[in-house]
């Protein structure tokens, strides 16, 4: 049975991965749809503003802090090698670290950086905007599913 500080660590992992999944789900289900409905110049400007304002201590604490929690869960699981839940705990950590945090670094952030380099009212921005929305949203769907799946398998480890 998982108990004590290890239990608390895993519950924190469930909460963190679940909160991140919720934020990503909001972007996938309505924020990006709303932005896509705007004229390209407005959509580009709005998304660039969102990307700048998203880098706050609160968001970074939740997002990067959850990645640290998931890494800690993986390390502690390897050290303790519990009789029950080890597969779920390692899978949950991998899902979040690679499917959410890692994917953010290799898929979403580079697209955000590319969007930041275009001037909102230009033909270049108008041409890039539909591609950005499609690709960014697709990768965000993957991050959403990976984060939610991490929360679920962490919960399964506790059951």
Regions found by a protein language model. Give the residues of each.
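Interfacial segments of alpha-helical transmembrane regions
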Residues: 3-17, 79-99
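Core segments of transmembrane alpha-helices
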Residues: 63-74, 143-151
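Interfacial loop at the N-terminal end of multi-pass membrane proteins
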Residues: 7-8, 19-64, 110-134
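Transmembrane helix-loop junctions in multipass membrane proteins, especially transporters and channels
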Residues: 32, 36, 78-85, 109-113, ...
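Small-residue hotspots
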Residues: 74, 92-94, 100, 150, ...
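Membrane-helix exit/interface motif
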Residues: 31, 47-51, 68-80, 103, ...
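Acidic/histidine-rich alpha-helical segments that form the ligand environment
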Residues: 90-109, 113-117
């Amino acid at each position: 049975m998982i108990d004590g500080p290890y239990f608390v660590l895993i519950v924190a992992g469930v909460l963190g991965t679940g909160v991140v999944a919720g934020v990503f789900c909001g972007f996938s289900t309505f924020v990006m749809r709303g932005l896509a409905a705007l004229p390209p110049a407005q959509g580009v400007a709005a998304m660039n503003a969102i990307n700048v304002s998203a880098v706050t201590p609160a968001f970074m604490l939740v997002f990067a802090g959850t990645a640290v929690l998931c890494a800690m869960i993986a390390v502690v699981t390897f050290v303790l090698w519990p009789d029950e839940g080890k597969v779920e705990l390692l899978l949950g950590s991998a899902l979040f670290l690679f499917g959410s945090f890692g994917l953010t670094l290799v898929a979403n952030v580079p697209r955000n950086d590319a969007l930041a380099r275009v001037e909102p009212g230009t033909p270049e921005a108008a041409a890039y905007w539909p591609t950005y929305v499609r690709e960014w949203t697709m990768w965000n769907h993957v991050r959403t599913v990976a984060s939610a799946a991490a929360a679920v398998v962490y919960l399964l480890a506790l059951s």
